[in-house]
């Protein structure tokens, strides 16, 4: 019983890490919540002896890619995706993908993320704009300035998001070498809007409190189990 409670305690500790990160990013644009999935683990020794006991563990944390609410900002450099897909970014070590369209202009005119990574055009190159001229971004990502087409935002989609892993709070990179990006055809772009986090602060806080209570109960169970084991050993020693 003590081992079972200890295993549950470890699983809840992992959950607390995930949930604390969700709470911290509840107001981060384009953030996708981390979720926990509890599985049951049986050791090789237990399986070999047909021992029925199993241990709860977080089998595999997963990312919830559900779309967040779109929020109007009025900033022409802010863009939100409505539908499936990602903005393609030139990261420091290769392509990255994000739902956070909080873009800005670098001193050289490149359209970048807040971290300074260039936003990719459909040609794979950065988009370079004139900060003194009006910027229009259409629903298909075409960028124009005073009637002149500058380029088009590259929108990527994937047959499965299982092969994507988080890099930082709002970026994703391809971890599965077999996974290839395709053109996102089911999404439209809304200029002057941003997609909010898909985890609300209230929801994340409630879940955090719930898991914290479970953690405290399991912690007590481990302590009580340890004391019972100690007393049992002492009683055996008296025999």
Give residue spans per PLM region.
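Amphipathic alpha-helical polymerization modules
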Residues: 1-239
């Amino acid at each position: 019983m003590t081992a079972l409670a200890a295993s549950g305690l470890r699983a809840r500790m992992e959950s607390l890490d995930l949930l604390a990160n969700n709470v911290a990013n509840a107001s981060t644009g384009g953030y996708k919540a981390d979720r926990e999935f509890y599985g049951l683990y049986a050791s090789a020794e237990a399986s070999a002896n047909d021992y029925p006991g199993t241990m709860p563990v977080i089998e595999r944390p997963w990312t919830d890619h559900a779309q967040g609410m779109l929020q109007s900002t009025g900033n022409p450099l802010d863009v939100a995706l409505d539908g499936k897909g990602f903005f393609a970014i030139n990261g420091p070590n290769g392509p990255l993908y994000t739902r956070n369209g909080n873009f800005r202009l670098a001193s050289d005119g490149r359209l970048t993320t807040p971290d300074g990574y260039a936003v990719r055009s459909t040609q794979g190159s950065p988009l370079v704009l004139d900060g003194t001229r009006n910027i229009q971004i259409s629903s298909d990502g075409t960028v124009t300035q005073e009637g002149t087409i500058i380029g088009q935002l590259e929108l990527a989609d994937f047959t499965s998001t299982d092969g994507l892993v988080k890099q930082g709070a709002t970026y994703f990179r391809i971890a599965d070498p077999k996974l290839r990006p395709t053109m996102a055809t089911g999404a439209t772009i809304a200029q002057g809007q941003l997609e909010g986090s898909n985890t609300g602060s209230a929801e994340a806080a409630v879940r955090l409190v719930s898991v914290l209570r479970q953690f405290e109960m399991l912690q007590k169970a481990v302590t009580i189990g340890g004391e019972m084991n100690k007393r049992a050993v002492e009683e055996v020693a008296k025999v």
